[in-house]
Amino acid sequence: MDRSVVTQKIIEAKVRNGMKWSDIAKAIGESKEWVTAGCLGQMTFTKVQAEAAGKLFDLTDEEMAWLQIVPYKGSLPTAVPTDPLIYRWYEIVSVYGTTIKELIHEEFGDGIMSAIDFSMDIQREPDPKGDRVQVVLSGKYLSYKTY
């Protein structure tokens, strides 16, 4: 068994039971964004979170243990994503990545935006021309040090 087997079991239970990520997140006690990432194998659950997931998805003790192991993050199956929605993010970074980098450096200096001390919020934004997806990414600024 490995983390991908647990992820597949979670997805199957979610579909079978008609669950929504927002409801799963409420039961586990964290944001829908973080819980979704965790259920998809990208975050480490605490024992309490793993037990809550275990109740929701009828997981075994071994499967709950896998949720508590630090995963291999960013483990998409291909270098360039083929899923259209994920590919749009790849495209956004390809087109706007240098702009984002320049503007962050201009505002903060030489450093990076953390993906560890990080939060994300995804909301629906009503628009008469067609609803929009609003994504807010917030990462701590980390300055490179000289030595």
UniProtKB/Swiss-Prot annotation:
Q: Does the keyword Ribonucleoprotein apply?
A: no
A GO MF annotation of the entry reads: DNA binding
4Fe-4S recorded as keyword: no
As its record notes, the protein acts as a catalyst of: cyanate + hydrogencarbonate + 3 H(+) = NH4(+) + 2 CO2
According to its UniProt entry, this protein's organism is Polynucleobacter asymbioticus (strain DSM 18221 / CIP 109841 / QLW-P1DMWA-1)
List the gene name: cynS
The protein's UniProt keywords, in alphabetical order, are:
Lyase
Q: What is this protein called?
A: Cyanate hydratase
Q: Which SMART domains match?
A: Cyanate_lyase (SM01116)
Extract the PANTHER family matched here: CYANATE HYDRATASE
The signal sequence is: none
Tell me, which GO biological process terms does this entry list?
Answer: cyanate metabolic process
- What the protein does? Catalyzes the reaction of cyanate with bicarbonate to produce ammonia and carbon dioxide.
Q: Which domain of life is it from?
A: Bacteria
Q: What class of enzyme is it?
A: lyase
